[in-house]
Curated annotation (Swiss-Prot):
The keyword Translocase does not apply. InterPro entries: Spider_toxin_CSTX_knottin, Spider_toxin_CSTX_Knottin_CS. Residues 21-44 form a propeptide. Keywords: Disulfide bond, Knottin, Secreted, Signal, Toxin. PROSITE patterns: SPIDER_CSTX (PS60029). Belongs to the neurotoxin 19 (CSTX) family. 01 subfamily. The presence of a 'disulfide through disulfide knot' structurally defines this protein as a knottin. Disulfide bonds join C48-C63, C55-C72, C62-C87, C74-C85. This is U3-lycotoxin-Ls1i. It holds the Pfam family Toxin_35. One of its GO terms (cellular component) is extracellular region.
Length: 115
């Protein structure tokens, strides 16, 4: 029984050591790959599309507002057959930005009173 227990501890130790070595090798490979990608990276920042402008050609390049990114929303106007897509801010995000702005102002007042 003691032999089986010692053999099991030996196997667990050996397995943990070998897996740690493999993880170190993977981490080094990931770092090298990341560095090569950073070196090859080109400037790819495009101009963002302002709110209420057409975004049908690129739905992921809407501009950011103060806190959140605008969303490309598509709809059919009344009596029209063509789909229109524009960058818009969803109402719930608009209300969240207003609440955050009021909280900032209130925090500034409290800081002024006690600071």
């Amino acid at each position: 029984m003691k032999f089986v227990l010692l053999f099991g501890v030996f196997l667990v130790t050996l397995f943990s050591y070998s897996s740690a070595e493999m993880l170190d090798d993977f981490d080094q490979a990931d770092e090298d790959e990341l560095l090569s990608l950073i070196e090859k990276e080109e400037a790819r920042a495009k101009e963002c599309i302002p709110r209420f402008y057409d975004c049908s050609h690129d739905r992921h390049s809407c501009c950011r507002s103060e806190l959140f990114k605008d969303v490309c929303t598509c709809f059919y106007p009344k009596g029209g057959d063509n789909e229109v897509c524009t960058c818009q801010q969803p109402k719930h995000l608009k209300y969240m930005e207003k609440a955050a702005d009021k909280a900032k102002k209130f925090g500034g007042k409290i800081k002024k009173w006690f600071g």
